[in-house]
């Protein structure tokens, strides 16, 4: 079986497990929307331009709660499941790519709902044609966060408090993704070019892809 077919099968299994458990959209997403509502209610009445903080709140909530969504598959990984994958001859790179694709799809849906909630709660002043560039920024940000979370989950695999340790690994490394995505949306609001920020996101995603594929086998051997 080719690398691509193995990756698609890993993605299919992870999405099937998430569909049955439903943590991302039944538990994490409602809490994220409530957190966004709390932000909107906590803004002082004297602050007139509420829309200005809408995108800031969106990315803060999306990254903080999105980490938990992306880490779900890694946290659910058991030693028995790893042994089965090894016995079946699953390529570690395919596992990384497949899990990253599954997490990215979940994050795209997760961020799409948060984006709608942000527009409804904060009513930002968005220019015409904002949807396409914003969707592009969300897509690349979701892909980067998914790969980073998958890689962090592999590094923290087998350790106590795996979820907390993986979150600590992600926090400093997610900065280029947050900067690129948030500035892309801000540039849209200012009618400026978003090319440099999209290139930053693409470069970060490619670096994470290379690192994840390259480190997948050493990390698997270290976890034995």
List each language-model region with its residue ranges.
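Membrane-interfacial helix-loop-helix connectors in multipass membrane proteins
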Residues: 44-53, 116-139, 185-198
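A structural motif at transmembrane helix-loop-helix junctions in multipass membrane proteins
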Residues: 137-171, 221-224
């Amino acid at each position: 079986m080719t690398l691509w077919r193995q990756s698609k099968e890993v993605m299919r299994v992870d999405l099937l497990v998430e569909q049955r458990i439903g943590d991302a959209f039944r538990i994490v997403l409602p809490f994220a929307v409530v957190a966004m509502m709390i932000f909107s209610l906590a803004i002082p009445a004297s602050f007139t331009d509420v829309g200005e903080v809408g995108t800031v709140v969106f990315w803060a909530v999306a990254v903080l709660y999105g980490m938990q969504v992306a880490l779900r598959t890694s946290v659910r990984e058991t030693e028995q499941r790893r042994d089965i994958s090894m016995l079946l001859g699953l390529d570690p790179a395919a596992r990384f790519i497949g899990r990253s694709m599954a997490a990215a799809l979940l994050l795209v849906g997760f961020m799409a709902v948060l984006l709608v909630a942000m527009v409804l709660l904060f009513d930002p002043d968005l220019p015409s044609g904002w949807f396409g560039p914003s969707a592009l920024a969300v897509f690349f940000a979701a892909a980067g966060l998914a790969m980073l979370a998958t890689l962090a989950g592999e590094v923290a695999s087998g350790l106590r408090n795996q979820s907390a340790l993986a979150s600590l690994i992600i926090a400093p490394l997610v900065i280029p993704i947050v900067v690129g995505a948030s500035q892309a949306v801000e540039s849209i609001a200012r009618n400026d070019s978003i090319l440099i920020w999209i290139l930053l996101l693409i470069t970060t995603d490619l670096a994470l892809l290379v690192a994840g594929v390259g480190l997948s086998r050493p990390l698997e051997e270290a976890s034995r």
